[in-house]
From Swiss-Prot:
Annotated stretches, region: Interaction with GATA1: 640-1146
Coiled coil, from the record: 591-615, 1029-1110
Domain SAP: 633-667
Species in which this protein is naturally found: Mus musculus
Positions where Phosphoserine occurs in the chain: S453, S682, S694
Organism domain of life: Eukaryota
Region (Interaction with GATA2): 200-657
Protein name: Cell division cycle and apoptosis regulator protein 1
Length: 1146
């Protein structure tokens, strides 16, 4: 990527329109500042004075008649929109017609604040082929710019302008700028420098205090403002008689400018700080500018960009101004039909319009049956394609490989999986890429396609009617789903996989024997990617590219001038896809390789650790001194004394007595130190142990985490995905160690640029264009076949009229039967309700009309881009049903009564469930309708039919289009979708002769007929003494492949089902175990409850017995008490009798 987001120029260097580019007139040019003056005091004289024009010498300074008209129009518009507080520009002198018309003048750089403000048209979108090739040599980026910018950074010796342009303080002329100052910059571009744009001169613009003021009025779009000439630094440029406007202005160009309405006064575009902007040059013809990167082909874009909304806003603002003016001119009066506040509140909300996607249709606008192409034809077709200097011819052999009778079939599932460079292949690759006898006369290259299955293509790109809404909203263009395996040389250089022909390895005579170059392709593909293409059964020769190579020296030998032919093959690589069982075997092999690698790394790490420990132990043995308590210096030998002194880093020289004294002194010092350390050690031992443990734990955790991350990274590289794919092992040593492989979609390959100026990138881009054209032709032919099979539109109308007449007759008969029957009693009340409902509906319609008046005014001026074909279709249906409205009004009461009886059935009829029955036709339309608008315009569909190479006439195409076109649009969903009730869809196949259009009517050479007659018997070959029909074998092979794919799919479904059943069985077993455990617990609890019951029953019996015993004892006690009481009563009675007797006796 370049420094500025993929472009070589910074943002300020690419702000040019299609007819306006920035180019300095000369080096060292200074633009006079207009910042010092206020917009309120500008006049035409001051503007002319700023431009270097005065009225003292009118003979030398005269404008053309068209310029005078522009100045007068500016004065009129400015007076019309004048305000009381603002002074506008005024024309104070009459300009005369010049004596000589200026035809060719150099362009003048205008500040954008004073230049035209006409809205710039958006880039037109066709097939997104870029600028014409004729201007490629002139579209190189300009090396020098003169502009104004703001200082964003400033250091001691250098600074930056607009964050992109580097300047040194030595390049500053005059006053040193500060951060935020506006400066005039002269910069040059150098791609070899760290900062691509370097300023040669910097000059601070004066009047910085007024640079932040905003203009009070916007300059009208139709006025060309006075021109400010550029001057050199410090020197005022002398005006010249023939360089007043420095632009070619014609009378034809002034007419639309004068007719353009001015912009509103109070709406100002938001400007940056200051009035001066990067200059814009006005020229009569497009000047060479740097080509911007083309937008993606398969993105949602419109042909006219945002012009329509701008025009619509202009019209609405113009109407608002006209209404305000009429209100200001007319006196205040009471409206005769003033709306009441209640009515204002009761107004129904404005109807929300359905959001229609932007119409985007792209296709190649040339005949797609061209078998060859030269330099000029390539330029005309692909204006964005870089063409190598040695190229001179290309043969498009795909036209013969995929004729109209046998087109290419999408939907063959295939995918690639690129392995990491550290992962080695399970099988050793013995293929040779560059043999010593490699001959550059022929090269064979392959383009390997990866594609989803047909069902996935339908669901992901077509938005089928039966799909859920979220899946329909996430559609993708088929060109994004079809992908190719390409080689990558460097960072962004795509290349086709292949190499040069070798006579010793591939065989001789490649021009006669087609199998020679196929062997070359197999060998080179095996060497570069590890893919064995020998399994492929069909090799389609897609294109041949020829280069004229001059004489050169290759590997020390001189190669004469020759023609190199590059053949691009398109094999059926999906036959190389491993089966499910083979894929499982490969997955186990790579897992085993991962285990072996991890074990080898672990052993290696353990061996290194043991060696380090051994080395450390030896060093410790040598360097560790003996403890002082174990030494007796007087009894030691001289050598032992010297070793101990050396281990303690002391001098070992001298006599024995000196050595003894030196060692004794050192031992005493060690003894004292050790005593001190023992005291301190006892205090710090506990703290050190805790710290060591925590540090060791942290190191261990960090080591384990790193090992786990490394293990997961290794597993991601070695573990294969679930779905089978062709494994790719790029040869990292090829192409000077810069080779890699990538899977890129067709849309990405089509989005090439002129900067892709490599020969191998040219081949890939050309193949992408040819493959896209092949798909366009096949899908276009599919549309053509469907149009042929449709009946004429008149037959449809007749059938519809007959069915309508029959329905009317049935309704009339039913109505007569209802009249004969007795009327219900409450019919009158029902009629009254119907009348009330009619009145309410009329009131609502009036309200809707009042609310939609403004919308109707805006919609009257809409052009074809604002035309909604879906609404047009509804309106057409309403016109067709207008005749039935009278009958419906008469039968309204009967229908309403009928609806009350059967409301559910009517609802079902109103919203039928749609189903896509013709998926192939839907995909054909969707390939062109990239934004899924649901329709194709008649002009686009007509051009698509012309590009098919069927040589159809306009009358034939018009007749076909009349079958399906409604108001200049073809709604293809009516052809592909139907309700579930009418799901039985039968297609009438057209004759084979009609499929070829008018090609059979063209004169054919006799040579081709003879070759065709000879080719009829090519399908029969002799093999082992028997005649073999290759065509039938291929058909059987295709059938067997389809059966195999279906069997594998069913097997996969069964495996998935088996896995699900295994999971359910496991869940059932787990639940059974849990239930059995619960059952055991319940039984245990039951046993305990039974034991408790027995204990409680025993206790109950004991209590009952005790209670009975207690009752018996109590009864005996009561009896005893009663007997005792009786005895006492008898004794008391006896005493009473005795006392009575004694009393009577006394």
């Amino acid at each position: 990527m370049a420094q500025f987001g993929g472009q070589k120029n910074p943002p300020w260097a690419t702000q040019f329109t299609a007819t306006a580019v920035s180019q300095p007139a000369a080096l060292g040019v200074q633009q006079p500042s207009l910042l010092g003056a206020s917009p309120t005091i500008y006049t035409q004289q001051t503007a002319l004075a700023a431009a270097g024009l005065t009225t003292q010498t009118p003979a030398n300074y005269q404008l053309t008649q068209t310029a005078a008209l522009q100045q007068q129009a500016a004065a009129v518009l400015q007076q019309q929109y004048s305000q009381p507080q603002q002074a506008l520009y005024s024309v104070q002198q009459q300009l005369q017609q010049p004596q000589q018309t200026i035809l060719t003048q150099p362009a003048v750089a205008l500040p954008t604040s004073l230049s035209l403000s006409t809205p710039q048209p958006a880039a037109q979108i066709t097939v997104s082929y870029p600028t014409p090739r004729s201007s490629q040599q002139q579209t190189q980026p300009q090396k020098q710019r003169v502009f104004t910018g703001v200082v964003t950074k400033l250091h001691d010796t250098f600074g930056f302008v607009d964050e992109d342009v580097f300047f040194q303080l030595g390049a500053v002329k005059g006053k040193t700028p500060q951060v935020g100052d506006r400066v005039l910059v002269e910069a040059t571009y150098n791609p070899n420098m760290p900062f691509k744009w370097n300023a040669q001169r910097i000059q601070t613009l004066p009047n910085q205090n007024q640079s932040q003021t905003q203009p009070l009025l916007k300059t009208p779009t139709a006025v060309i403002q006075p021109i400010v000439p550029q001057t050199t630094f410090g020197v005022q440029a002398q005006p010249q008689p023939q360089s007043l406007l420095q632009a070619q202005i014609s009378a034809a160009s002034i007419t639309p400018l004068l007719q353009t309405q001015p912009q509103p006064l109070l709406q100002q575009p938001q400007q940056k700080a200051g009035l001066l902007q990067p200059p814009v040059r006005i020229v009569s013809q497009p000047q060479p500018a740097r080509r911007l990167d083309p937008p993606s082909r398969f993105s949602g874009r419109n042909d006219r960009g945002d012009q329509v909304p701008n025009r619509k806003d202009d019209r609405s603002r113009e109407r608002d101004r006209e209404r305000r003016r009429s209100r200001e001119r007319s006196p205040q009066r009471k409206r005769s039909r003033e709306r009441s506040p209640r009515r204002e509140r009761e107004r129904s909300p404005r109807r929300v319009r359905r959001v229609v996607p932007r119409y985007t249709v792209q296709f190649s606008k040339f005949s797609l049956d061209c078998p060859s192409c030269d330099m000029m034809e390539l330029r005309r077709r692909y204006q964005n394609l870089y063409i190598p200097s040695d190229f001179f011819d290309a043969q498009f052999t795909w036209v013969d490989a995929f004729p109209l009778s046998r087109p290419f079939q999408l939907g063959n599932y295939c995918n690639f999986y690129v392995m990491h460079r550290e992962v080695e292949s399970l099988e050793k690759n013995m293929a040779v890429l560059d043999p010593p006898d490699a001959d550059h006369l022929y090269s064979a290259k392959v383009m390997l396609m990866a594609s989803p299955s047909m069902e996935d293509l339908y669901h992901k790109s077509c938005a089928l009617a039966e799909d859920p809404q979220d899946l329909r909203d996430g559609f993708q263009h088929p060109a994004r789903l079809v992908k190719f395996l390409v080689g990558m040389k460097g960072k962004d250089e795509a290349m086709a996989i292949g190499g040069h022909w070798s006579p010793s390895l591939d065989g001789p005579n490649p021009e006669k024997d087609p199998s020679v170059l196929i062997k070359t392709a197999i060998r080179c593909c095996k060497a570069l990617t590890g893919i064995d293409l020998s399994v492929c059964t069909q090799w389609y020769r897609f294109a041949e590219i020829r280069y004229h190579r001059p004489e050169e020296t290759h590997k020390g030998r001189t190669v004469p001038a020759h023609v190199e032919t590059v053949v691009l093959f398109f094999p059926d690589v999906w036959h190389c896809l491993p089966t499910r069982s083979e894929w499982e075997t490969l997955s186990r092999g790579y897992k085993q390789q991962l285990v072996e690698k991890l074990q080898g790394e672990r052993k290696k790490a353990d061996g290194e650790q043991d060696e380090e420990e051994k080395d450390d132990g030896e060093v410790k043995e040598i360097a560790t001194p003996t403890h002082w308590s174990k030494l007796d210096p007087k009894a030691m030998k001289v050598n032992d004394l010297r070793k101990e002194l050396e281990s303690r880093a002391l001098s070992s020289k001298g006599l024995k007595s000196q050595l003894i004294a030196r060692l004794t002194k050192q031992l005493k010092i060690e003894e004292q130190k050790e005593e001190q350390k023992e005291l301190e050690k006892s205090e710090k031992e506990e703290e050190d142990e805790d710290d060591k443990k925590s540090e060791d734990d942290k190191e261990e955790e960090e080591r384990k985490r790193q090992e786990e991350v490394e293990r997961q990274r290794q597993e991601r590289r070695y573990i294969l995905p679930d779905e089978p794919a062709i494994i790719v092992h790029p040869n990292w040593a090829a192409k000077s160690g810069k080779f890699d492989c990538s899977i890129m979609s067709l849309s990405v390959l089509l989005d090439y640029r002129l900067e892709d100026n490599k020969e191998h990138s040219f081949e890939v881009s050309l193949f992408a264009e040819l493959f896209n054209e092949m798909l366009q032709r096949d899908f276009g032919v599919r549309i053509y076949k469907s149009l042929l099979s449709l009946p004429e539109k008149e037959d449809k109308k007749d059938k519809e009229k007959k069915s309508k007449k029959e329905e009317r007759k049935d309704k009339k008969e039913e109505r007569e039967d209802d009249i004969d029957e007795p009327k219900p009693k409450r019919r009158k009340s029902g009629d009254d309700k119907d009348k009330k409902e009619d009145r309410d509906e009329r009131k609502k319609e009036e309200k809707r009309k009042d609310d939609s008046k403004d919308d109707d005014e805006t919609e009257e001026d809409n052009n074809q881009d604002e035309y909604d074909p879906m609404e047009a279709e509804e309106a057409e249906d309403e016109d067709d049903d207008r005749e039935e409205e009278e009958v419906k009004r008469d039968d309204k009461r009967d229908v309403s009564r009928y609806c009350k009886d059967r409301p559910a059935k009517d609802k079902e009829k109103e919203k039928p469930q749609m189903v896509t029955v013709n998926r192939d036709l839907l995909m054909a339309f969707v390939y062109f309708d990239q934004s899924h608008c649901g329709y194709l315009l008649e002009k686009d569909l007509e051009e698509i039919l012309y590009t098919l190479g069927l040589h159809l006439s306009r009358a034939q195409v018009k007749k076909l289009l009349n079958k399906v076109v409604l108001r200049e649009s073809c709604f293809y969903r009516k052809l592909t979708d139907t309700s579930k009730d009418d799901e039985n869809h039968e297609e009438s196949e057209a004759l084979q002769e009609d499929m070829l259009g008018n090609r059979l009517l063209l004169p054919t050479p006799t040579i081709k007929q003879e070759s065709k007659d000879g080719e009829e018997n090519v399908g029969l070959i002799v093999y082992n003494g028997a005649m073999v029909d290759v065509g039938s074998l291929l058909q059987k092979l295709e059938k067997s492949e389809k059966v195999r794919a279906e069997v594998e799919q069913k097997l996969q479904l069964l495996e998935e089902k088996t896995d699900e059943d295994g999971k359910t069985i496991l869940n059932l077993e787990n639940s059974n175990k849990s239930l059995s455990g619960e059952l055991r617990e319940v039984k245990k609890d039951l046993g305990q409850l039974q034991e408790n019951l027995e204990v409680s029953e025993n206790m109950n019996l004991q209590f009952e017995n005790q209670l009975n015993k207690t009752l018996r004892n109590l009864s005996t006690v009561m009896d005893d008490i009663h007997t005792v009481l009786k005895k006492d009563n008898v004794k008391s009675e006896d005493r009473d009798e005795k006392s009575k007797e004694n009393g009577s006796g006394v």
